[in-house]
Amino acid sequence: MRVAIEVADWVAVCFNAAVTETYRIPDKRRHPGMGRLGPDLCESNTDPSVAVNLLLSHKVGADQLGEVLLDQRVVRGLGNLYRSEVLWATELSPFARIDSLTERDAIRLINAATTMLRANMQRAECAASVAGKGGLAVYGRNGQRCQRCGETIDCRPFGQHGRMLYWCRGCQQHHDPHQEMQTENMPIDPHPAAQAYLAGLPWNRNVS
């Protein structure tokens, strides 16, 4: 199923949606879950401490950090690309259990996400806190060297929806549970929207 939301200046397209739901703003009872959305880090009036508290109080402590960051009830606005970039910037393992995080970890993570998202709202190309080609540190760079430690960047489908996760085993070891994990030898994120984005990155363009 494909869903498109169109306004005067933008069109947002969702590919391969397993389930879609709609609701009317005047009557949120049609979709009571909308009342439980977390704070949007892109909004200037958002208090980041709210997201910190929601992250630390996540109801299932054994859930992995990389999955929880995409939970809209915890935080909005992050998305798959910045999930990978923010975890790299803070040197946190995406496989860390939520109940292993300290308050300092959560504050660093949310502050990094807030800074990164707001800085990129007006940019044509996404950029992480440490800029490499295209401004990204790990997303779309599987098989390349980490610019911080020199190890090879890995990727694998991760979480309930199988979104592609990019991370560095060498320097993202904080709270890593040291579980054996198999990485996938996949050149790019298989999601259609991600394929279109990654194909346009400088190092993926065909040079004639």
Q: Residue locations for each model-derived region?
A:
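Phosphate/anion-contacting hairpin/loop surfaces
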Residues: 1-77, 82-89
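Basic, nucleic-acid-binding surfaces and adjacent catalytic neighborhoods in DNA/RNA-processing proteins
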Residues: 54-208
